Amino acid sequence: MKNPLHYQLSEYDCGPTSMMNALAYLFEREEIPPEAVRNTMLYCLDCHSKEGIPGKRGTSRAAMMFLSNWLNEYGDLGIMSVSSEYLSGRSVYIDGESRINHALNHGGVAVVRLYLEEEHYVLMTGIQNENILLFDPYYWDKPYEQKDILMDDKHPKEYNRIVPFQYFNQENKEIIYALGPVEEREAVLIFNEKTKTVPEEVIEYFI
């Protein structure tokens, strides 16, 4: 059985929440070892505030890269059928040819750093026409000013937002869900190797 995706508990834990949501989306509850949950929380929330308070600046890029590499090694050991790839800079964009779109079209997900007033992590789970299906872990129950960004509460195990492509590739940090300056971008692609599809399988499916 798969669990519903969940929301962050504080103002700071969007990173580990999105990483654990990635596992919850890709795997049955019985397939997720407790070690994966423990290490996700252990490696994240590593940034200190200006006052020196741990965790109050969220999760660093270094921590996400480390966690991505750890998941890969965990998969290589055969403990869990997981694989991961860390992307940064020019590799992080939304387009028909992008690595993120390719992952979403082939059974994978992407945990992406973007902007929601401040730097923020969300989980991308799919594509619908020219929109990204994503789960934003920051609970919000008011409609957006942007009428083309849709809220969805009917797919709790998959997504809660439908966001047009056009928002993501913006470098302006003031734009909601913008990926921001190219040199600062990052994403973590994650797959369940048992459910990952290859291009040939997708083509045959649509035929």
Place the predicted regions along the sequence by residue:
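Hydrophobic transmembrane alpha-helix bundles
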Residues: F66-V82, V112-I127, I149-N160
